[in-house]
Amino acid sequence: AQFYGKSQNYTQIPRKWYKKYGVKRGLRNEDKTGVLIGLTRIADVVGYKIDDEGRKCDAEGELYYRGISVEDMVSSSKNVKNLYEEASFLLLFGYLPTEADLHKYSARLKDGYELPGGFLENHILRYPGKNLMNQLQLGILALYNYDKNPDDTDVYKTLVKGIDIMAKMPSLVCYAYNAKQHYYGRESLVLHYPKREYSTAENILSMLRLDGSFTEEEAHLLDVMLLLHADHGGGTNSTFANVVVSSTDTDLYSSIASSIGALKGP
């Protein structure tokens, strides 16, 4: 403590230096607008507008995926039970899926719902965690060892790996929560397998509830929430962390784990 207190005399950087040398304080400019870190055609978050005098003004929030408003997606979609699946297809491939496209894509997700054999017992139940974000990091990193070629960064193969990770997210999150509540909350441990006939939202609700029950309204609400959180562009800390880490040509599991670490911060 003594050394730490004294060290403060040698570590402070005057705020005026940031302006003098044009250094950004985090991912914000001085006027509180976002720092431009790259270009994307995937997602666009509109949280403010610039008036005629160049001042930043708060605006009604808008979110676009591939140029399509999420409000329009929710209101016009024919796939009432698979909004998240439809949105993730759009984000990954750049266009809205046909009914046949969505069916094939959803089937691919369903193929990856379940965790590898022994994963639940060895990586989740044996080592329950106090924080779900840390557990999710560990879970993602552990999946690396179940991949036959985890360090292959070919674009197409990375896409396939990413879809498989997406498919397993409900199981990773829900089982980590169940283990935490059992070990730290002293609650009964009841586990449900993901069901192939369920969507991502439906499986999350089913796996979290002791009796596995949920209403259509609950499933639809969670489906919309998943859609809204599917992508927020490149200006968030978690996405930025992924951009930095993946630029080293590391494996996908390490990149995603770094994003989760950044996302955990308040």
Describe the residue ranges of each PLM region.
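Hydrophobic alpha-helical bundle cores within soluble ligand-binding/oligomerization subdomains
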Residues: 1-266
